[in-house]
Amino acid sequence: MNKKILISTGGSGGHVIPATIIYKHLEGNFDVSMTSDLRGIKFLNKDEYNLRIFNVRPISKNLLLMPFDFILMIILIFKSIYFLRKNKINILISTGGYMSLPLCIGAKILNIKLLLFEPNMVLGRSNKFFINYCQKIFCYSNNVKKFPIKFKNKIKVIPALLRKNFYAKRDSNNSLDAINLLI
C-alpha cells in the first residue's frame, strides 16, 4: 500500500508552482493529492492533479470581521480533520501561507507527519508557526532569514525544484548538424 501524501498550497504562483513540481515527482511512487484555495486554482490544470479546494480566507484586521473569520477558521479546522482522517493521509507537505493553516493544525491534532517547504529566503509566518511541529523544512538555503536557531537541525537544503521534463534524457541523434554563431 502506497503512503498517502497531501500537498497543501494556494495563494500565489510562488507557493503553487513548487507544489505542482513536488506533486509530479512523487506521483509515481505515492498516492498524492493536493489542496488549494481559490486563488491558487488559476495556476493549476484541474485535470492534471488530484485536487480538492479548501477556500481559506485571510484573517481580517478589521475588528468587526475578526470573530467571523475566527469562527470560519474553526470550521475549516474541523473540516480539515475530517478530510485528513477520511482520506487516511500519512504525510502532509505544506508550501506555507495562511491557506495551509487549517490542514496543518488538523495534521498536528491527528499526529500526521508534517513536512514544510519554504520557497523564500525569509521564513514565512505560517511556516514559522508550524516549525515546532514539523519533522523537516525544505529550503533552498541554510541562511533563511528569521529562522529560529533552535530549529536549524530541521532544515533540509534542496536544489532548486525543476519539472520532471528537465531531467528527461535528450535524444543525441536529434542534435543540430549546424551551429549558428552570432557575432
Describe the function of each predicted region.
Residues 2-10, 28-72, 156-159:
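Conserved nucleotide-sugar phosphate-binding/catalytic loop shared by glycosyltransferases and other
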Residues 7, 33-35, 116, 139, ...:
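Structural beta-sheet core signal
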Residues 7-20:
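A short, glycine/small-residue-rich beta-strand->loop->alpha-helix junction that serves as a flexible
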Residues 39, 108-170:
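Active-site-proximal region of nucleotide-activated glycan assembly enzymes
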Residues 62-91, 101, 105, 109:
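An amphipathic, basic-hydrophobic alpha-helix
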Residues 95-99:
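Short His-centered aromatic/hydrophobic patch
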Residues 175-183:
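Conserved donor-binding/catalytic core segment of Leloir-type glycosyltransferases
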